[in-house]
UniProtKB/Swiss-Prot annotation:
Protein name: D-aminoacyl-tRNA deacylase
Keyword check for Cytoplasm: yes
Key words, A-Z: Cytoplasm, Hydrolase, RNA-binding, tRNA-binding
Biological process, per Gene Ontology: D-amino acid catabolic process
Organism expressing this protein natively: Shewanella baltica (strain OS155 / ATCC BAA-1091)
GO CC term (a single one): cytoplasm
Disulfide bond positions: none
SUPFAM superfamilies the UniProt entry points to: DTD-like (SSF69500)
One Pfam family here: Tyr_Deacylase
Length: 145
């Protein structure tokens, strides 16, 4: 399971000209599911995302996590994160989870974060989305479990 996380001052996702999710300070999480992913991996990754220290403390060091800064999550499914780009000029998605598996783990990821008290907005699974963000820093990390 892969999460490309970006520290944002604001982010939103639009489907069919309608804003369906938006946050201010927090993290934009692009979430990719791979074939071998499980609920256990999802919980480990969600915990890591929420606990990852990527916000600056009073000394300017990345020492604070999402909860410590009162931030929110915007979680957007992105199967292209599971692409194999090692050969040729066209990505292979053979390692990506099936749509049913990916939807289930995506929904469980969101529910897990919400159950931990984190304000969590979402995109729309499988939709053509326009994602806008102001990357604060920029600060971006690729987390994988």
């Amino acid at each position: 399971m892969i999460a490309l996380i970006q520290r944002v001052s604001r982010a939103s996702v639009v489907v069919d000209n309608q804003t369906i999710g938006a946050i201010d300070k927090g993290l934009l999480v692009l979430l990719g599911v791979e074939q071998e992913d499980t609920r256990e991996k999802m919980e480990k990754l969600a915990t890591k995302v929420m606990s990852y220290r990527m916000f600056s403390d009073e000394n300017g060091k990345m020492n604070l996590n999402l909860e410590q800064v009162g931030g929110s999550l915007l979680v957007v499914s992105q199967f292209t994160l599971a692409a194999d780009t090692g050969r040729g000029l066209r990505p292979s998605f053979s390692g990506a989870g099936t749509p049913d598996q990916a939807l289930a783990l995506y929904e469980e990821f969101v529910a897990f974060c919400r159950a931990k008290g984190v304000t969590t907005e979402t995109g729309q699974f499988g939709a053509d989305m326009q994602v806008s963000l102001v990357n604060d820093g920029p600060v971006t990390f690729n987390l994988q479990v």
